């Protein structure tokens, strides 16, 4: 894109349902979090629910992984940093009396700093593999880095604020300047040019 349309700076807006219409919020620095996804596949050995001793239950291992993942933010991310690990989906089996061969967890992972993003990825893989091993199962993690942190450069943010003031007065700017943990693909552009 920037090869076709070279520029010195780039500007964009993201609508925010629930915020007042006709108002603007400008957040300098990290304004929106990175967004990654992970699919954790836990492999065991299926069997009959009446004979669990003859199987390796991936559902129990997956449940343990879900609980252990909750310790990453509580015990690995520094207290003044933001890290989010959410298990949004669990898929396993089709029948109540059959232990399946596999279970799958789907995660969304958010951070504002590259160091925290790296930490979250590393710990998700470590925990998934170690917890699965406790139950005699294995786990693979397909980790996908999707959207980077949206970083608003201070000089361009100040320019945007001045444009809003000139257009709408001081009331056009919301006093709130807190970053949000949603993500935005405009962040890819701001990795290349200020904005």
Language model features: what each stretch is:
Residues 1-89, 93-100, 183-184:
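Histidine/acidic-residue-rich, glycine-tolerant segments that coordinate divalent metal ions
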Residues 60-195:
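Metal-dependent amide/peptide-bond hydrolase catalytic core
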